[in-house]
A protein has these predicted regions:
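ATP/NTP-dependent adenylation/nucleotidyl-transfer catalytic domains that generate, transfer
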Residues: 1-2, 7-118
Length: 118
């Protein structure tokens, strides 16, 4: 069997995922698409609007992703694709989250015994 990762580029960009949780998988079909692009794809595929436009939330604490992040996915997606973010404090927050969470996208470091024996 195979496990499909459901994270998208927007979530990955700011680390809004759980390592070995929702970010786990053998293939990431949405990994190079922003939230806005995923929504467009959903519409193109004819998915019900209530699913396509559902407010993103982790379902754990009653607040939305955007409330927790402090900016909208539309703002984030524009910054990812065009490099444009009109609010300097939001741009700094996005850059900070991206830098802090890049490790989530990297393979697990492995111990290399050869380097210790040289």
């Amino acid at each position: 069997g195979r496990v499909i990762n459901t994270c998208n580029l927007s979530e990955d960009w700011v680390g809004y995922s759980t390592r070995y949780g929702d970010s786990a998988g053998d293939v990431s079909l949405l990994g190079k698409l922003t939230v806005q692009e995923v929504k467009s794809l959903g519409r193109e595929l004819g998915l019900p609007e209530n699913l396509v436009d559902k407010t993103p939330s982790d379902g754990l604490c009653g607040s939305t992703d955007e409330q927790k992040l402090g900016f909208s996915y539309a703002v984030l997606d524009r910054y990812i694709r065009e490099g444009i973010c009109e609010d300097e404090s939001v741009r700094q927050r996005i850059d900070s989250l991206h830098k802090q969470n890049k490790f989530k996208l990297e393979l697990i470091p492995t111990f290399e015994p050869q380097t210790m024996m040289q």
